[in-house]
């Protein structure tokens, strides 16, 4: 992490490993109000992705870096976890899966300790892609507004969803 007001090539590693194994390539992140950091770890930074001989973790995970420096595995049910954000009340975690054959966004209800209960598909962009074949791009970064609407980059632009997962439109 480098301060933006005086950027320089000095970085502090907050977390580099899970259970003694180096992360694949941490990607997107979201802080909660406690100062804990949720982040995704797809294989995009590895030259050969899942087949890279330097790969140490054999899955792509979603993690929580606690304030005490401990890393907890939140989930490993996505092939390409990418964009990540929290609902305004921080009771729901949203994660984009940018895997071509299964392009979905999932929502996870969070327990009091910040860990996820079983997730559910929030929006599957497979049918959306079929209806709009000219709209290129995959599920990626996202943010939530004060009303809980999710603004997510995806096929053809920024898709806007209600908190219930209804597609409101695309910019």
Question: What are these model-derived regions, one by one?
Answer:
Residues 1, 37-46, 93-100, 149-155, ...:
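Conserved beta-strand positions in repeat-built beta-propeller and related beta-rich domains
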Residues 1, 60-63, 104-106, 157-159:
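A short loop-to-beta-strand structural motif that recurs across blades of beta-propeller domains
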Residues 2-53, 59:
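Asp-box/WD-like beta-propeller blade repeats and closely related beta-sheet repeat scaffolds
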Residues 3-6, 107-115:
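Short loop/turn segments immediately following beta-strands, especially the blade-tip
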Residues 6-9, 67-70, 112, 164-167:
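Short coil turn/linker residues within repeat-based beta-strand modules
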Residues 10-16, 73-76, 116-124, 169-171:
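Beta-propeller fold detector
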Residues 19-37, 56-61, 73-95, 125-155:
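Beta-rich, blade/repeat-based domains predominating
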Residues 56-60, 102-104, 116:
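A detector of repeated loop/turn-to-beta-strand junctions in beta-rich toroidal repeat architectures
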